[in-house]
Regions:
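Tubulin/FtsZ superfamily GTPase core signature
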Residues: 1-140
């Protein structure tokens, strides 16, 4: 399908280190729309965290089409019980996100509970070239 995806449920002794990594990724680097670390420190008190990372590859699908299809294909069972979602999307400067691609992110959040709080971050990563990186962190 032209997607690299990684899915991990974070728990146990590596929990704090994983949360530190998530917060660092969302608050550092070249962020067009940064997420403030104090806004997402609730992650340290979460009863569960599920992290999903997707990177599109050039192929027969448009880059966001393929990501949305993959997100929907491997929907987490905890998505409907989460009360927070963090979403980070990155592209390169030479291949920025278009408005039509941004609108497709509605597909990623449509099944969240209506009271879920969503924090967004948009960043630049020139190593991506014409690909898109999407990270979603569901928590409660």
């Amino acid at each position: 399908m032209g997607i690299f995806s990684e899915i991990s449920r974070i728990e146990g002794p590596e929990f704090r280190a994983e949360v530190d990594e998530i917060i660092w990724l969302l608050t550092h680097g070249s962020q067009l729309i940064p997420v403030k670390s104090e806004v997402i420190t609730y992650l340290y008190d979460a009863s569960f965290i599920e992290k999903r990372r997707f990177t599109s590859f050039v192929g027969g699908y448009a880059r966001m089409d393929s990501i949305v299809q993959e997100v929907n294909r491997c929907d987490p069972s905890d998505k409907d019980t989460c009360d927070h979602a963090l979403i980070l999307i990155q592209t390169s400067k030479d291949h920025p996100l278009t408005m039509s691609e941004l609108q497709m992110l509605n597909e990623v959040t449509r099944d969240l509970p209506p009271e879920a709080v969503i924090h967004w971050g948009v960043g630049i990563n020139d190593d991506l070239k014409d690909k898109v990186f999407l990270m979603i962190v569901y928590s409660k």
